């Protein structure tokens, strides 16, 4: 088992990474008599809910659970209300613990509930997808979507612990594994050139879920994110760099309807658009743009815009992005592989040109 610590100004919390952690009662920082509400979905529940309940009950906990429908389109205010109702009906107090057992949607929704139920209760993240293990479970971002924009209603709320059981990836559909690799590649592209080179050498092993490669990959991603969050917990500075490709990607998700493209798929195409725009601005080289494109393709990820979207469809969605300040578009771009920056007030004509260069052609 590996442990990565997230060091915040006022406290710290551990990220445990290993095989078989969900069934090991020693993984859980919960004492006899504690009350727990597990938030999950039917897809995850069929594999892991009984395992987690059994481990918690061995520790003497009182365990309830609530099932949300599966999918990004259920990352809504209505799902929040389902969990609030379950907590209230079962008389959970301020001393309860919420466990988010699932992927990014479950983590975001359960996290927002933990932030707001009785003004805040303890949260444990148990991510079961690669994307949530390397990204969304770490750092305290919680949110639900609005029909006009992704992640527009939320809060920063740190978990007390993240428990990453790499065995859960064995039941993950290949498409979901590939989507998670988009966020993995992002870390190398923005902050760690050596890790990007490692990915070029080992991406096939990650696609095939080789245990040693996976454990190294997940721990490195968590360490990179932990370091960024320690410097900038609420995204006032460096943390914005973690959004490479996300402004373009969120536009794709919102325009197509949540869930039609997976988040990682949209981010993959968004990273290509950001890289092409960076090259147009004279930053990253054509050769490095090609390296990024080839690595994404080897991870079976899209690198061109959906054929149902026109370049002009992007900007209205992008102008609702949370990084927009005073009506000016701000984008995360690349100086080089391993070095990102935030560009302020990027010329819309150049943005559209970059999108056109990433548009599907027959």
Curated annotation (Swiss-Prot):
Catalytic class of the enzyme: lyase
Cleaved signal peptide residues: none
Annotated binding of NAD(+), by residue: 70-75, 104-108, 128-129, 141, 150, 168-171
Coiled-coil positions: none
GO biological process annotation, one example: aromatic amino acid family biosynthetic process
Keywords, comma-separated and alphabetical: Amino-acid biosynthesis, Aromatic amino acid biosynthesis, Cobalt, Cytoplasm, Lyase, Metal-binding, NAD, Nucleotide-binding, Zinc
Cited InterPro entries: Dehydroquinate_synthase, DHQ_synth_AroB, DHQ_synth_fam, DHQS/DOIS_N, DHQS_C
Cofactor binding note: Binds 1 divalent metal cation per subunit. Can use either Co(2+) or Zn(2+).
Record bears the keyword Glycoprotein: no
Listed pathway(s): Metabolic intermediate biosynthesis; chorismate biosynthesis; chorismate from D-erythrose 4-phosphate and phosphoenolpyruvate: step 2/7
EC number: 4.2.3.4
Chain residues that bind Zn(2+): 183, 246, 263
Family: Belongs to the sugar phosphate cyclases superfamily. Dehydroquinate synthase family.
Protein name listed in UniProt: 3-dehydroquinate synthase
Gene name linked to the record: aroB
């Amino acid at each position: 088992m590996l442990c990565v610590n997230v060091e915040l100004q006022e406290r710290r919390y551990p990220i445990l990474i290993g095989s078989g952690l969900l069934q090991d009662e020693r993984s859980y920082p919960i004492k006899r008599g504690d009350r727990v509400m597990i938030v999950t979905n039917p897809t995850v529940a069929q594999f892991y809910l009984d395992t987690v309940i059994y481990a918690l009950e061995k520790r003497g906990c009182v365990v309830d659970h609530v099932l949300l429908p599966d999918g990004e389109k259920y990352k809504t205010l209505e799902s929040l209300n389902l969990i609030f109702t379950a907590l209230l009906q079962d008389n959970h107090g301020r001393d309860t613990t919420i466990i988010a057992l699932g992927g990014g949607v479950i983590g975001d929704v359960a996290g927002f509930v933990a932030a707001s139920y009785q003004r805040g209760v303890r949260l444990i993240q148990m991510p079961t997808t690669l994307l949530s293990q390397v990204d969304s479970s770490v750092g305290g971002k919680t949110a639900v979507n609005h029909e006009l924009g992704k992640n527009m209603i939320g809060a920063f709320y740190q978990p007390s612990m993240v428990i990453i059981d790499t065995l859960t990836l064995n039941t993950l559909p290949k498409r979901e594994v590939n989507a998670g690799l988009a966020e993995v590649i992002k870390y190398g592209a923005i902050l760690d050139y050596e890790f990007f080179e490692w990915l070029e050498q080992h991406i096939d092993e990650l696609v095939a879920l080789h245990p040693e490669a996976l454990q190294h990959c997940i721990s490195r991603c968590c360490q990179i994110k932990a370091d960024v969050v320690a410097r900038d917990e609420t995204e006032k500075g460096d943390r914005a760099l973690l959004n490479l490709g996300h402004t373009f990607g969120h536009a794709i998700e919102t325009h197509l309807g949540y869930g039609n493209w997976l988040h990682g798929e949209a981010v993959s195409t968004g990273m290509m658009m950001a890289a092409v725009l960076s090259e147009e601005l004279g930053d990253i080289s054509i050769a490095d743009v090609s390296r990024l494109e080839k690595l994404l393709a080897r991870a079976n990820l899209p690198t061109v815009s959906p054929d149902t979207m026109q370049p002009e469809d992007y900007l209205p969605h992008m102008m609702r992005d949370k990084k927009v300040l005073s009506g000016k578009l701000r984008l995360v771009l690349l100086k080089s592989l391993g070095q990102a920056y935030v560009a302020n007030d990027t010329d819309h004509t150049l943005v559209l040109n970059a999108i056109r260069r990433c548009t599907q052609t027959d």
